[in-house]
From Swiss-Prot:
NCBIfam families: rpsC_bact. It comes from Hydrogenovibrio crunogenus (strain DSM 25203 / XCL-2) (Thiomicrospira crunogena). It comes from the Bacteria. This is Small ribosomal subunit protein uS3. The gene is rpsC. Disulfide bonds: none annotated. SMART domains: KH.
Length: 228
């Protein structure tokens, strides 16, 4: 039976970048990894309602640089920067190292898979019909420039006794094309009937143009050297 690979994991180094960027020897690797997990856990707990999509962690010299990608930067920063300062102090206490926090605003949350999945889950928790929630998310994404989107929900849909999965797709989502820029995320909705899983794939276009332009330039330069 064929198994499905993670759409982001297979594209790391091609169209996607790593969420954590640092180097460590074998002695410090496990400590850094556990520290990263604790930082993400702390931020996700304190920023539940801030529409956080991604947390990037970089380790430089003797400090940690954390970049938070959010659709609501004002909620993260707080009044006169009070909330972000509290976050910074909490992370310094947890890691024991200087921490620098940067905020990156997500201009189009309708094209972010994590935020779309979270939005659908919140609607399901409010007892909105799953088909309506799915179609609304799909139409918003396509209206704002997505080339394709697929949404999958699974569980006791509408309180049915037997769990099932249903999906809705518009446009194209080429999962086997590595140059395709596909955003993928999952989220869980806690309903009175149990958990409902939400998966979202968003295809934003292909990222081959820049790579091909560089390779063409290299070919031309090699050709000129050969003529000499």
């Amino acid at each position: 039976m064929g198994q499905k690979v993670h759409p982001i994991g297979i594209r790391l180094g091609i169209t996607k970048d790593w969420n954590a960027r640092w180097y460590a020897d074998s002695k410090n690797y496990s400590d850094f990894l556990i520290s990263d997990i604790e930082i993400r856990k702390e931020l996700n707990e304190k920023l539940k309602h801030a529409s956080v999509s991604q947390i990037n962690i970089e380790r430089v010299a003797n400090g940690v640089r954390v970049t938070i990608h959010t659709a609501r930067p004002g909620v993260v920063i707080g009044k006169k920067g009070e909330d972000i300062e509290k976050l910074k102090q909490a992370l310094i206490a947890k890691t024991g190292m200087p921490v620098n926090i940067n905020i990156e605003e997500i201009k189009k949350p309708e094209l972010d898979a994590k935020l779309v999945a979270e939005g659908i889950a919140q609607q399901l928790e409010k007892r909105i019909q799953f088909r309506r929630a799915m179609k609304r998310a799909v139409s918003n994404a396509m209206r704002l420039g997505a080339q394709g989107i697929k949404v999958n929900v699974s569980g006791r849909l509408n309180g049915a006794e037997i769990a099932r999965a249903e999906w809705y797709r518009e446009g194209r989502v080429p999962l086997h094309t590595l140059r395709a820029d596909i955003d993928y995320a999952t989220f869980e909705a806690d309903t009175t009937y149990g958990k409902i899983g939400v998966k979202v794939w968003i295809f934003k276009g292909e990222k081959l143009e820049k790579i091909s332009m560089v390779s063409d330039d290299k070919k031309q330069s090699k050709g000129k050297k050969g003529r000499k």
